[in-house]
């Protein structure tokens, strides 16, 4: 998958980003290099290889000490929404930004 300069300028326009031509060309190069890397990774046959949660453990003798994922405090929705300018039925109301 390769992007064109038109794609980059269109995406910038949709994201409401001002982008000079030189920046758009540099971004195009970087994005195409990134997509090339993704295509290389997708081409690798990983059949029969177990996914790794912590790949660093395979090359370094280090144990990742992770805390147990447990709820330590409860969230009170009303307290969190009190400072919001507009709330309805427990949801934050925001201005429409998509045309």
UniProtKB/Swiss-Prot annotation:
EC class name: ligase
Catalytic reaction list: L-glutamyl-tRNA(Gln) + L-glutamine + ATP + H2O = L-glutaminyl-tRNA(Gln) + L-glutamate + ADP + phosphate + H(+); L-aspartyl-tRNA(Asn) + L-glutamine + ATP + H2O = L-asparaginyl-tRNA(Asn) + L-glutamate + ADP + phosphate + 2 H(+)
Record bears the keyword DNA-binding: no
One of the record's GO molecular function terms: glutaminyl-tRNA synthase (glutamine-hydrolyzing) activity
Xref: InterPro entries: Asp/Glu-ADT_sf_sub_c, GatC
EC number(s) per entry: 6.3.5.-
Pfam entry (one): GatC
Gene Ontology biological-process entries: glutaminyl-tRNAGln biosynthesis via transamidation; regulation of translational fidelity; translation
Keywords, alphabetical: ATP-binding, Ligase, Nucleotide-binding, Protein biosynthesis
Keyword ATP-binding applies: yes
Assembly mode: Heterotrimer of A, B and C subunits.
UniProt-listed NCBIfam families: gatC (TIGR00135)
Record HAMAP family: GatC (MF_00122)
Function, as annotated: Allows the formation of correctly charged Asn-tRNA(Asn) or Gln-tRNA(Gln) through the transamidation of misacylated Asp-tRNA(Asn) or Glu-tRNA(Gln) in organisms which lack either or both of asparaginyl-tRNA or glutaminyl-tRNA synthetases. The reaction takes place in the presence of glutamine and ATP through an activated phospho-Asp-tRNA(Asn) or phospho-Glu-tRNA(Gln).
Name of the molecule in the record: Aspartyl/glutamyl-tRNA(Asn/Gln) amidotransferase subunit C
């Amino acid at each position: 998958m390769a992007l064109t300069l038109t794609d980059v300028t269109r995406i910038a326009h949709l994201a409401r980003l001002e982008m000079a031509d030189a920046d758009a060309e540099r971004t195009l190069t970087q994005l195409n290099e990134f997509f090339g890397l993704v295509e290389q990774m997708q081409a690798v046959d990983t059949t029969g290889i177990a996914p790794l949660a912590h790949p660093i453990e395979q090359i370094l003798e280090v144990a990742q000490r992770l805390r147990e994922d447990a709820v330590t405090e409860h969230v009170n929705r009303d307290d969190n929404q009190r400072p919001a300018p507009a709330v309805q039925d427990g949801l934050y109301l925001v201005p429409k930004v998509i045309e």
